[in-house]
C-alpha cells in the first residue's frame, strides 16, 4: 500500500507501491556503478548544479526566483541514496528514511533515488498542491518498465480531458444505486463462501486466500465473469503480467519484461472475447452491469471509435492492477491488527453482532448503508489504512518550475508526495505507531482532513472506488467476526518492496454460534 490509490477496487494505478521488484533495480544499479565511477566528476557536477545554468543570465534569473531548491543530499553518484532508501524499507519503521532527513533539512528535501534527483515532501500542504495541480503542472512519473508494459495511452499516462472523462464515467458507475444493490449481494456471497472454506482448513494463510477472493470480486465488477476455469486462467495470466511492472526494461526473449508482455497479449485476448460478445448483445435500455458496459456505451472517446474492443479490453486489464495488492493487503492487515488488539476486536464484535441481531429480528437483508453505518467498523478501516500505508506516496514530474511554500521544484525534477510520512507524523496523530481505532472519534479537524489522510490518493486521480473499497472491507469484517473465531500465529509486517505479511498471516478458524463470543486469540 502511490498505482500506486492512495487500498482498493479501482485504486488509481498511479498509486502503485514503488518499487515493485527492487532486486531488478539493485542489479541495474551495480551494473552501472563502474560507469558511474568513471563519469563521477561529470555526473556529480551535473546533479549538484541542476538548479542553475551557466553564465550571468542564470544568475539574474536566480535573483528573480523567490523559492529555493530544498536542502538535502544527493548521495553517491548514480545510485544516490537508494541503498539507504531500501534498507529503511526493510526495517520495522520504513518512514525512518524520511524522518531522518526531515530532522536535518525540513519537511521538504532533495535526495537521489536510482540516479534520479528528486524532491520528497512530507508536508501535507505541499502534498495537496502536488496532487491538485495535475496535468498542467505535474504529470505522473513512472519507471520505464511500466510505460513499456502498459503503453503511452494507458490510464497511468493519460492526462487532461481524456483522463477526467474516464475517471468521471467509472466513478459515476461505482456510485450508482443499481450497482450498490447488486454488488453488496455479490460481495456478501463471495465473502460467505470464502470464510466457510476457511473453517474446513487446518491452517489458513489469510494473505493468499483474501487475494483470491478480492480478484474474483474485482473481475465481477469489471466484466461480470464468475468464478470457474476461465477466472483461474485469467488470474494466472494476470499474475505473470504484473511481475513486469517494475523490472529492467529489456525486451529480449527470456527477460522479465518480455514474458510479461506476452502474458499481457494473452490476457487481452481473453478479455477481448468477452468484450466482443458483449458488443453483439449490447443494449442501452437497461442499466450498465459492469465497467465493460460503461466503456462500450460511452461515445465520447475518439480513440475508442476506431477499435472499441481493443480500447475497452486494454482499459479493463489496466483496471485489474490496483486491486491485486491494495485490497488484499488492507483486509489482511485488519485481521493482523485486530488479532494483536483484543479490546478493539471485542468492540468490533459487539457492534457487528448488534446489527446482525437487529437484521434477523426484522427479517431484512443487509444494504450498503447498513455496513457503512457501522461507525466503529469504519474507525477500524481508517486506522488500518493509516497504519498500513499500502500506498506510501505518489510520484510526479514537474512540467515547469514550481514554487510551493517557498520551495522551488525545478522543471524536469520528480517530486514524491509522501503519504506515509503524514500518516505517521506525531504532530498530527498521537502515538502514530499504536493501533487505536478510537482516535477517529476524538481526532482533531486537521488530522481528519483530506490532506492529512490520503490512503486513496487525492486530486483528479482520487480513487473513484474508495466507497466500494470500504464496503468490501466492512462486509468481510462483519461476517468474519459474527460467524467465526480465529487464533493467529506470530507474524510480522514487511514494508518492502510492497507491504505484506512475512508468513502470509497464518490463522486457525473455527465457527461460532450467535450466543458464543467470536473472540479467540492467542496471547501476544
Swiss-Prot record:
GO-annotated cellular components: endoplasmic reticulum membrane
Disruption phenotype: Plants with short petioles and round leaves. Altered polar elongation of leaf cells. The double mutant plants cyp90c1 and cyp90d1 exhibit a characteristic brassinosteroid-deficient dwarf phenotype.
Protein localization: Endoplasmic reticulum membrane
CDD domains in UniProt: CYP90-like (cd11043)
Tissues expressing the protein: Widely expressed.
Lipid biosynthesis among keywords: yes
Keywords: Brassinosteroid biosynthesis, Endoplasmic reticulum, Heme, Iron, Lipid biosynthesis, Lipid metabolism, Membrane, Metal-binding, Monooxygenase, Oxidoreductase, Steroid biosynthesis, Transmembrane, Transmembrane helix
Binding site for heme: 463
InterPro entries in alphabetical order: Cyt_P450, Cyt_P450_CS, Cyt_P450_E_grp-IV, Cyt_P450_sf
EC number(s) given by UniProt: 1.14.14.147, 1.14.14.-
Membrane topology classification: Single-pass membrane protein
Pathway linked to the protein: Plant hormone biosynthesis; brassinosteroid biosynthesis
Residue ranges of the TM segments: 25-45
GO molecular function, one term: iron ion binding
Required cofactor names: heme
Major subcellular location class: endoplasmic reticulum
Function: Involved in brassinosteroid (BR) biosynthesis. Converts typhasterol (TY) to cathasterone (CS) and 6-deoxotyphasterol (6-deoxoTY) to 6-deoxocathasterone (6-deoxoCT).
Family label: Belongs to the cytochrome P450 family.
Name under which the protein is recorded: 3-epi-6-deoxocathasterone 23-monooxygenase CYP90C1
Organism: Arabidopsis thaliana (Mouse-ear cress)
Taxonomic placement: Eukaryota, Viridiplantae, Streptophyta, Embryophyta, Tracheophyta
Amino acid at each position: 500500500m502511490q498505482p500506486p490509490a492512495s487500498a482498493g477496487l479501482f485504486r488509481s494505478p498511479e498509486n502503485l507501491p514503488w518499487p515493485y521488484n527492487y532486486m531488478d533495480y539493485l542489479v541495474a544499479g551495480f551494473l552501472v556503478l563502474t560507469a558511474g565511477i568513471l563519469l563521477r566528476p561529470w555526473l556529480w557536477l551535473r546533479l549538484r548544479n541542476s538548479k542553475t545554468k551557466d553564465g550571468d543570465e542564470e544568475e539574474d534569473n536566480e535573483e528573480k526566483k523567490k523559492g529555493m531548491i530544498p536542502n538535502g543530499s544527493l548521495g553517491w553518484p548514480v545510485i544516490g541514496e537508494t541503498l539507504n532508501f531500501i534498507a529503511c524499507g526493510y526495517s520495522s519503521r520504513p518512514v525512518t528514511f524520511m524522518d531522518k532527513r526531515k530532522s536535518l533539512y525540513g519537511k521538504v528535501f532533495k535526495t537521489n533515488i536510482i540516479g534520479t534527483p528528486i524532491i520528497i515532501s512530507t508536508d501535507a500542504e505541499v502534498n495537496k498542491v502536488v496532487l491538485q495541480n495535475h496535468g498542467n503542472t505535474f504529470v505522473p512519473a513512472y519507471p520505464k518498465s511500466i510505460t513499456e508494459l502498459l503503453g503511452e495511452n494507458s490510464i497511468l499516462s493519460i492526462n487532461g480531458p481524456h483522463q477526467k472523462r474516464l475517471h468521471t464515467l467509472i466513478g459515476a458507475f461505482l456510485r450508482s444505486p443499481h450497482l450498490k444493490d447488486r454488488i453488496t449481494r455479490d460481495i456478501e456471497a463471495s465473502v460467505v463462501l470464502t470464510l466457510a472454506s476457511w473453517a474446513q482448513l487446518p491452517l489458513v494463510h489469510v494473505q493468499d486466500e483474501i487475494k483470491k477472493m478480492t480478484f474474483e470480486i474485482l473481475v465481477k465488477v469489471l466484466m461480470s465473469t464468475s468464478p470457474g476455469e476461465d477466472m483461474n486462467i485469467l488470474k494466472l495470466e494476470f499474475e505473470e503480467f504484473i511481475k513486469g511492472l517494475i523490472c529492467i526494461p529489456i525486451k529480449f526473449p527470456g527477460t522479465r519484461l518480455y514474458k510479461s508482455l506476452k502474458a499481457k497479449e494473452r490476457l487481452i485476448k481473453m478479455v477481448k472475447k468477452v468484450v466482443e460478445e458483449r458488443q453483439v448483445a449490447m443494449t442501452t435500455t437497461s442499466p450498465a452491469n459492469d465497467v465493460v458496459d460503461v466503456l462500450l456505451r460511452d461515445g465520447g472517446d475518439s480513440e475508442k471509435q476506431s477499435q472499441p474492443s481493443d480500447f475497452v479490453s486494454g482499459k479493463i486489464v489496466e483496471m485489474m492492477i490496483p486491486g491485486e495488492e491494495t485490497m488484499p493487503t488492507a483486509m489482511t492487515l485488519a485481521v493482523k491488527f485486530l488479532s494483536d488488539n483484543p479490546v478493539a476486536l471485542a468492540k468490533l464484535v459487539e457492534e457487528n453482532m448488534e446489527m446482525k441481531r437487529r437484521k434477523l429480528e426484522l427479517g431484512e437483508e443487509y444494504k450498503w448503508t447498513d455496513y457503512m453505518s457501522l461507525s466503529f467498523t469504519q474507525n477500524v478501516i481508517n486506522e488500518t489504512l493509516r497504519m498500513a500505508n499500502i500506498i506510501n506516496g505518489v510520484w510526479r514530474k514537474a512540467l515547469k518550475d514550481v514554487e510551493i511554500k517557498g520551495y522551488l521544484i525545478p522543471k524536469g525534477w520528480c517530486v514524491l508526495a509522501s503519504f506515509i510520512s503524514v500518516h505517521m507524523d506525531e504532530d498530527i496523530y498521537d502515538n502514530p505507531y499504536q493501533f487505536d481505532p478510537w482516535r477517529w472519534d476524538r481526532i482533531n479537524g486537521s488530522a481528519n482532513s483530506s490532506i492529512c489522510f490520503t490512503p486513496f490518493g487525492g486530486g483528479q486521480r482520487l480513487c473513484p472506488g474508495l466507497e466500494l473499497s470500504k464496503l468490501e472491507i466492512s462486509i468481510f469484517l462483519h461476517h468474519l467476526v459474527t460467524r467465526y473465531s480465529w487464533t493467529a500465529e506470530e507474524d510480522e509486517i514487511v514494508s518492502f518492496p510492497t507491504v505484506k505479511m512475512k508468513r502470509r498471516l497464518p490463522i486457525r478458524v473455527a465457527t461460532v454460534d450467535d450466543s458464543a463470543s467470536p473472540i479467540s486469540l492467542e496471547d501476544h
